[in-house]
Amino acid sequence: MNSLQVLTKKVLIENKAFSEYHEDDIFILQQLGLWWHNGPIGFCKQCKMVTSGSMSCSDVDSYELDRALVRAVKKNQTDLIKLFVLWGANINYGIICAKTERTKVLCIQLGADPKFLDVGLYNMFIDLIKQQKVLLAIDIYYDNISILDSFDSHDFYVLIDFIYNCFILNLDEKEKMIKNTYVLKFWFKIAIEFNLIKPIRFLSKKFPHLDYWRLKTAVYLGNVDEIHHAYFQENIRLDPNDMMSLACMYPQNKLGIYYCFVLGANINTALETLIGFINHEVNREITFFSNYGIWSNVHFCISLGANPYTKKIQETLLRQEKNVIMKLLFKKGLLSPHSILHKKILEPSEVRKIISTYEYTETFHSFSLLRDNLQ
């Protein structure tokens, strides 16, 4: 026979926590282990979210079940640890964050693999990336010095794809980042890259010192939703031309380039930035086909109205005539502005529609034409 406590906890799986309760009920709820985050605890089985009081599953402060377990483990809250495991939380996430031997032993008793700390850390990191569990990953790794120190330095940077991310992660850093900051910005970047709204809002609230880095990352990755939110709802502003320079550095970044253009960036300056980048990289034998991403940005800037025949650009082209992209730009009249891009729209959903229409009507035909003109 189940005790009242166990039955109550099981019932709460099906029913969200009540928001109306008498002050005298608080003590009873606390004794039953049903009080969490300043309110009666509840669990939405469909969303796998732990709530408190009148909190809804979509609230920024609501917790995914595994995150709730990690929080309880960090605070050595024995009753809550048992409750969250009863509801289906992965206890291996808990043992990683256990700060005391007693809590670690409890995690093992509840089913955690004692070998997980030795053999499971890398696989877990990769799984969290694949599942895009940004907030859970930050809860596990951020400020978890013992776990971060357990990673070999070389393996650590390889693990988070150092070569691919080093530019944007190191942006705004005056000194070499410690692992803790690197982990935070790595997962924050994933949230921005895949437009994970709840993680972005949660991290923005918790780490306001990263506001300008967040906007720069959104521009670099072409996340127009986050650019719009930061720029117009939070009044986080940067010079449009500086933003455009970042947008141009990311391959095939039509969304980012267009948005910076609409915000007031000089499109001729953007083209000069791209040509300068190509000029810098030309010795690496970049070709039209192997550097499609950067060429796509050049082509798009011209479609927005950039003039490839300015004196400054032509002087650069003369020095690098051997490059295929440069040869294309020499063909006067081959590339021209696209009529659909004359509209200046700031609403993210409408921006995506414009770019989608542009790509459908321009890209495939245009590149076929360009190929024919190279013969």
Curated annotation (Swiss-Prot):
One of its GO terms (biological process) is taxis. InterPro entries: ASFV_MGF360. Plays a role in virus cell tropism, and may be required for efficient virus replication in macrophages. Belongs to the asfivirus MGF 360 family. This is Protein MGF 360-5L. It comes from African swine fever virus (isolate Portugal/Lis 57/1957).
